[in-house]
Structures are given as C-alpha cells and as structure tokens.
Design a protein with these regions (language model features):
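Short helix-initiation/N-cap motifs at beta->coil->alpha
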Residues: 38-47, 132-136, 220-234
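A local structural motif
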Residues: 5, 29-39, 56, 122-129, ...
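Conserved N-terminal structural module of periplasmic/extracytoplasmic solute-binding proteins
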Residues: 1-67, 83, 126, 297, ...
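Glycine-centered hinge/linker elements that transmit conformational signals in sensory
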Residues: 142, 182-222
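Extracytoplasmic/periplasmic solute-binding protein
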Residues: 100-104, 136-190
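Hinge/lid segment of periplasmic solute-binding proteins
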Residues: 63-119, 138-140, 262-264
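Conserved C-terminal helix/tail region of periplasmic/extracytoplasmic solute-binding proteins
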Residues: 148, 313-314, 326-335, 342-396
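Extracytoplasmic/periplasmic substrate-recognition and gating elements
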Residues: 28-29, 33, 119, 254-321
Length: 396
C-alpha cells in the first residue's frame, strides 16, 4: 500500500547514514515510506520513554535488552515469524516465552590480538587456539617482552569495560548460560556463594592480574586512553587488548591491509564448561515493533521489513556489508569483512558463544566498574574487591 509509512528509531548513531540510504532504497522497491530518526544525547531508554509519554512512538525501536523488557506490554510477539527458527529466538529478546526483540547484531568480547605483530616479534607462528591457560598467556607475553615489545597488553580503564565486560564474564562463565549466571548472583545475594571460593572468579582474576602486570599503562592505569589503546594494538606496538568486535570502528582507520587481527577467548586456568573455547556475547541491539501507537497496517509493514532484512539480498547486504555487523541468522552466508567481526562470526557459526547475562541492575557497570577501577589502580586488594561486589549484590 503506497500510503503506509513506518518510522524507525535508530540508537546506533554511527549507522545513521546507512539507515537513511536503506530507507530510500526500500521505499523505491516496495512503495512503503520509511522514516529513520536517531537518538542524540539521551540514552535509548530516556529517548523512547519520552516518546511514549508524548505519543510520538516509532513503529520500530532499536533498544537494549532492558528497554525491550521495560516496553514488553507494547512490543509485538514475533514468535511465529519465519526467521525465529534460524537465530531469531536463539539470539532475540524473549520475555515470558514470547519473542519480543529481533536480534539486530551479534557482538562478543575477548582478547583482541595482532597476529602479525606477535609473529614479527617472536619469530614464531601464532595460533590463538594453543593459548588456553594463564600460564600459556604468560609464556607468550614473556616471549614478546624478550623480543623487545616491552608492554604487550592494553586494558581499558572505562567502567563499562571493567564492570560491564570483564566482571560480567565471571557470571556468564559459571556455566555459559543466563540461568547459570542468574543462579550465581542469587547465591551471592543470599550469602551461599563467596567469590573468594569460586573457581571461575579466581581464574579470571588471576588472568586479570597478569594483564595488569604487562599493561602498557601500568604506571598510570586509570589514565589510559581508549583511542591510544586502539592505535597501539592496530599498529602492533602491543599484542593484546581486552575488548570486543565493536572496537573495529576505532581500529579501522589505522589498520594496514596486510596485518592480521582477531579475537580469542580469555585464557585462564579453569577450563570447566569449555570456558576457554567460547567468547562471551550475543545480540546487543534488538528491534521491537510497537503495538500501541502504530496501526495494524504499520505493524504488518514493520514485520515485512524485518523479514526483508533477513531474506532479501539487499537486506542482508545492509546488515553485513554496509553496517559491518555480524548477523544473528544462519541463512545469511555473506562474510563480514572486518577481521574482528569475522572472528565473532566464526565463533557464532560454531556455536561457541556464551550468552551475555543481561539481567543486571542499571547501575551495575558504573558502581562495580568503579570498584574494578580501584583494583586496576592498586587502590584495593582482591579481598576488598570481593567484599564490594558481594555487598553490592546483597543490597539489590
């Protein structure tokens, strides 16, 4: 129907140009008018809350998991869509057994490595699958130091990286499922779990201590600069950076075509549940369809649009080639061209991704990120950090 118009609220502002071009193409192809606005200044949650208050609500909203949970009563049930069976349900946002959020992209985190730099400095072939334990990692770090790379590691000081990404792996890697993570934090809350006695905590923190020791910003770790870290790994001044595939945005402008990069799981001594074989990640943005302010024709047009993204060549091209995203759907065989995305795509295809634990309080990464910053800066002991984390959860 030529009169149908759908609106989309994009909350990944780095993709706004691609979205606008897509909207134009889509209208030419289908006759459906698509208008894309972008969140500026506000968090996605703040922006969409204001829009629901004013009644100016987009047909499709791109949100984080907590936004979809908050808007559950207005979100269309997508469980019966054709794409649900090929990654939609597995990676989508499911609330009370109903699929409410379409998984827009897969992101995962681990140790980013510069394979080319490692091989040049050590004179040996680098195979990340052979670096499994903390001791394996120490051995390669020492080789790099001996070869002249004085500080082979970068650690971000940002609270989201420390509290939102490194610490949450302790939850996610209890057994690789969101349920296992939930049981673990419930155990901290009721006092039945003590971090100091937990193998995964000790294992990941032993590796963290090692990364701290070889950190290029060791002398002043809380003054580390994210962009400097990105440049250092890209140009081969360092070998390893704890981060995720989103970092390609900062790395790409400095990358040389003949340099090989990838992401590997965090090496650690506790290999239970294949923790050293898996990246932690999952969908990081979801598309939901509003049923309160958008009429049935708009809702159907929005469903058609999501179907087109998954099954139409132009839709697939938008996700993978234009936006450089790792798709959640197994029918899409386009290969992501950026090397970090390619790593994550391979782990996804091999089903070696541990679920992101999303059921975290809104202040988790800020509050516990600040405690992790103290530990990174040697301003507290591991026991004091354990006590801070336990007391945070017991207050929830």
């Amino acid at each position: 129907d030529d009169n149908t118009k759908i609106t989309i609220l994009n909350t990944k502002d780095e993709l706004q140009t691609q979205w606008e071009e897509l909207a134009e193409e889509y209208e030419k192809t289908t006759g459906v008018k698509v208008e894309v606005s972008v969140t500026v200044g506000d968090s996605p949650s703040e922006d969409i809350t204001k829009r629901y208050a004013s009644g100016e609500v987009p047909t499709i909203f791109m949100g984080d998991v907590q936004d979809i949970l908050m808007l559950d009563e207005y979100a269309m049930d997508l469980s019966d869509e054709e794409w649900a069976d090929i990654g939609g349900t597995k990676f989508g946002c499911v609330v009370n057994d109903k699929l409410k959020g379409f998984p827009f992209c897969i992101e995962a985190r681990g140790l980013i490595y510069n394979k080319t730099a490692i091989e040049e400095v050590t004179g040996e072939e680098f195979d990340p699958s052979q670096i499994k334990t903390t001791d394996d990692l120490k051995a390669i770090l020492d080789k790099l130091v001996d070869g002249g790379m004085e500080t082979p590691v970068a650690l971000n000081m940002e609270d989201w990286s420390l509290g939102g990404h490194y610490l949450t792996q302790v939850y996610e890697e209890q057994d690789g499922t969101a349920k296992g993570a939930q049981d673990f934090v419930d155990g901290i809350k009721d006092g039945s779990v003590k971090l100091g006695d937990n193998d995964r905590w000790n294992s990941l923190m032993d590796t963290f201590d090692l990364l701290k020791e070889y950190n290029m910003n060791k002398d002043n770790p809380l003054a580390s600069d994210y962009d400097e870290n990105a440049i250092s790994i890209t140009e081969g001044d360092i070998a390893f950076w704890f981060n995720g595939n989103w970092a390609w945005a900062e790395m790409s402008e400095f990358a040389e075509d003949d340099t090989e990069y990838g992401i590997m799981p965090i090496p650690q001594n506790d290999a239970d549940n294949d923790a050293t074989e898996n990246l932690c990640g999952g969908a990081t943005k979801y598309l939901m369809i509003d049923t309160k302010y958008n009429d049935e024709k708009q809702q159907q047009a929005a469903k058609d649009f999501l179907h087109w993204l998954v099954y139409d060549e132009d839709g697939q091209d938008f996700l993978v080639n234009k936006c450089n995203l790792v798709p959640a759907f197994s029918n899409i065989d386009l290969e992501v061209t950026n090397p970090l995305g390619a790593s994550v795509q391979k782990y996804t295809a091999d089903e070696k991704i541990f679920e992101t634990f999303a059921n975290l309080p809104g202040d988790h990464w800020k509050t516990l990120g600040a405690e992790m910053q103290k530990y990174l800066g040697d301003q507290c002991t591991r026991e004091e950090l354990e006590a801070s984390i336990e007391s945070y959860w017991q207050k929830q």
